[in-house]
C-alpha cells in the first residue's frame, strides 16, 4: 500500500465551473463558500474573481483537449491569491449562481452538445459579488452538524426575513416565490 502525504492547506472553499470547446475555455464561473451544507458542500455561494484559476483552467483544458463541462474544487488563499486544488469532476454542479451572475453554463453546455460552436465568441465570465443560497442545503448541513431544532427554526426565520447568510442573496434550488411546489 502506498501512502501520499501532503501539507495542510488553508483558504476559502471555492469552486470553478467551466465549459470547454475542443480544448478552448468558453465559459467559466468561480464561487466561494458562504455557508456549509452536508459534507462541507457550498450551501451558500458568492461569485468571485480568481484570475489564476481561470488561467489554470484554460491551460488544463488546452492540454487535455477537453470538450464539455469541468468543475474544480479548491481552497483559495486570498492573501497569496493562490488556489490549492482538491479535485476535478467532468460535470456542472448547481450552476444557478452562474446564471444569476450572467453566465448560463447549462445552456452553453446544451448548445455545445447540439453542435453550436463558440469559437468566434469571447470567454464568458460571470459578474463578481453575486450571492446565492439553498435554504434546504443549509438546513441539512446545520442539522448534520448537530444544530438544535431551535437553531434550525432561527435559520428559517433568517431566510424569511433575508438576514444573515440570506441577506442580499437569491435562493438557487427552491425559489418559493417563483416555484411554490418546489418547497
Which residues does each predicted region cover?
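Hydrophobic alpha-helical segments and helix-packing faces
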Residues: 50-53, 67, 102
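Catalytic core of tubulin tyrosine ligase-like
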Residues: 60
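Phosphate-binding site of ATP-dependent enzymes
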Residues: 1-39, 45-56, 75-76, 82-85
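C-terminal, active-site-flanking charged/polar segments
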Residues: 101-112
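Conserved metal-phosphate-binding beta-hairpin within the catalytic cores
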Residues: 16-18, 64-96
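Glycine-rich phosphate/pyrophosphate-binding beta-alpha loops
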Residues: 34-45, 89-103
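Peripheral (often C-terminal) accessory segments that flank ATP-dependent C-N-forming ligase machineries
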Residues: 111-183
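Flexible, glycine/charged-enriched surface loops at secondary-structure junctions
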Residues: 4, 69-71, 119-125
Amino acid at each position: 500500500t502506498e501512502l501520499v502525504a501532503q501539507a495542510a492547506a488553508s483558504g476559502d472553499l471555492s469552486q470553478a465551473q467551466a465549459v470547454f470547446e475542443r480544448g478552448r475555455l468558453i465559459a467559466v464561473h468561480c464561487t466561494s463558500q458562504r455557508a456549509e451544507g452536508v459534507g462541507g458542500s457550498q450551501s451558500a455561494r458568492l461569485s468571485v474573481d480568481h484570475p489564476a484559476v481561470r488561467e489554470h483552467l484554460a491551460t488544463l483544458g488546452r492540454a487535455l483537449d477537453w470538450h464539455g463541462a469541468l468543475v474544480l474544487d479548491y481552497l483559495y488563499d486570498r492573501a497569496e491569491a493562490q488556489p490549492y486544488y482538491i479535485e476535478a469532476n467532468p460535470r456542472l454542479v448547481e450552476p444557478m449562481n452562474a446564471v444569476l451572475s450572467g453566465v448560463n453554463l447549462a445552456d452553453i453546455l446544451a448548445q455545445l452538445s447540439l453542435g453550436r460552436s463558440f469559437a468566434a465568441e469571447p470567454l464568458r465570465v460571470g459578474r463578481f459579488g453575486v450571492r446565492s443560497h439553498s435554504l434546504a442545503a443549509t438546513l441539512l448541513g446545520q442539522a448534520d452538524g448537530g444544530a438544535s431544532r431551535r437553531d434550525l427554526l432561527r435559520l428559517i426565520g433568517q431566510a424569511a426575513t433575508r438576514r444573515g447568510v440570506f441577506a442580499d442573496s437569491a435562493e438557487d434550488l427552491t425559489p418559493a416565490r417563483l416555484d411554490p411546489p418546489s418547497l
